[in-house]
Amino acid sequence: MDNMNHEELNDQLLVRREKLHNLREQGIDPFGKRFERTHSSKELLNLYGEFSKEELEEKAISVSIAGRIMTKRGKGKAGFAHIQDLHGQVQIYVRKDAVGDEEYELFKTADLGDLVGIEGKVFKTNVGELSVKATSFTLLTKSLRPLPDKYHGLKDIEQRYRQRYLDLITSMESRETFVTRSKIIREMRRYLDDNGYLEVETPMMHTIAGGASARPFITHHNALDMELYMRIAIELHLKRLIVGGLEKVYEIGRVFRNEGVSTRHNPEFTMIELYEAYADYKDIMKLTENMIAHIAKRVLGTTTIQYGEHEINLEPEWTRLHMVDAIKQYCGVDFWKPMSVEEARALAKEHDVEIKDTMEVGHIINEFFEQKVEEKLIQPTFIYGHPVEISPLAKKNDEDSRFTDRFELFIVAREHANAFTELNDPIDQKERFEAQLKEREQGNDEAHMMDDDYIEALEYGMPPTGGLGIGIDRLVMLLTNSPSIRDVLLFPTMRHKQD
């Protein structure tokens, strides 16, 4: 409605309210009752689209359809309209002599956006368009506001996000994105269920914000008079379940991080986390590439997808590259050799890598990767071997204790998954938490808190375990070729609208 001024809008609102009043005066309910449909627009097309005009006339197929009026034309005693349901549009043809005076008057006075029910016969027009010739016309819901201009739609991107219902009415592409999102999550569940994983539910409110490096949302429980944190990860509760003997578990759920909003970040987002006893990060790599390839095949019918200007091949096996080797390959800097923090800082200065004064060598290695390498990783790439300093919950590598058995998956220069061989040594875990507490004291409010209950759980014994986290929203972005996370969230977080 960006091309409709307020005066025009107010006039249309008044006209529609007047029509509402007239309907009630005639004893017609403008917000009607249940309507039984026999077919959707998609079913009509699939069943009868290949029939000839003559075949349809001979068969005289009766149907009952419903939807929103999107176009309307005609004068006198007959008219055409297109009505839209979930799957698409179908044309209806309404004649006064077929539906009667009262129902034809309803059709004549109906507005774009009204929801209607049609009973009639399937036919094809002279130009071959599959249509329904009405024998009955029922008003189901009177629309009191005009839809956006059909030729321009919602041009204001922010309005699309704030009023998603209008976006879904006017954009079949947007509607298809969210249908695809649902299919992606369904196939993910199917894959894990078929591979012996158990879906579980764990708390969204935690007494300690743990499982990730992020700033939490804080709330207050009045009855218990205590502060709680909206979860920033699902991880630590799932690993408690591994301790308890549930050997393969996963959860798909909302996670909350009190951080910035961008094309890749929303404060409230959906994650899947899974954990498998007696596995390691290499097993989880295989699971990750096989699961994502499976989802692409089942939902899209292919493992070759387009994202922006890039053609992405999701067919396993994907590239595996140690973080240090990736930095050496793309920057020519070798972090394999032992070095002091002063030497690492000098390298950062030489290569224009921004760092903080409190950073150790491991942090600087990660900054090199994020600032110089990440943007170059277009095809699916597992980056593994993250420094211990940035991986407080991952197991140290047996061959080089500076690094961990951890990986992140990058596609089109974005992180899509994070996984590791879980740290199951309670003594080492406590020392890592203590190191994180020192970082908090130095001003890093995203550093991990001490979680004594989790350490106690580890003391009972957690088997060697591989774990994985995937951002569902980013995966949906990838598989639907969507440039912004807001395009794949039905109701993204928005600033207050300015009056």
Swiss-Prot record:
UniProt keywords, alphabetically: Aminoacyl-tRNA synthetase, ATP-binding, Cytoplasm, Ligase, Magnesium, Metal-binding, Nucleotide-binding, Protein biosynthesis
EC number(s) on file: 6.1.1.6
A cellular component annotation (GO) from this entry: cytosol
Gene3D superfamilies named among the record's database cross-references: Bira Bifunctional Protein, Domain 2 (3.30.930.10), Nucleic acid-binding proteins (2.40.50.140)
Cofactor(s) this protein cannot do without: Mg(2+)
UniProt protein name: Lysine--tRNA ligase
Compartment annotation: Cytoplasm
Family: Belongs to the class-II aminoacyl-tRNA synthetase family.
Catalytic reactions on record: tRNA(Lys) + L-lysine + ATP = L-lysyl-tRNA(Lys) + AMP + diphosphate
Quaternary organization: Homodimer.
Entry binding sites for Mg(2+) 2: 415
Residue stretches spanning the membrane: none
PANTHER family the record matches: LYSINE--TRNA LIGASE, CHLOROPLASTIC_MITOCHONDRIAL, LYSYL-TRNA SYNTHETASE
Classification via Pfam families: tRNA-synt_2 (PF00152), tRNA_anti-codon (PF01336)
Gene Ontology MF terms in the entry: ATP binding; catalytic activity, acting on a protein; lysine-tRNA ligase activity; magnesium ion binding; transferase activity; tRNA binding
Gene Ontology biological process: lysyl-tRNA aminoacylation
Note on how the cofactor is bound: Binds 3 Mg(2+) ions per subunit.
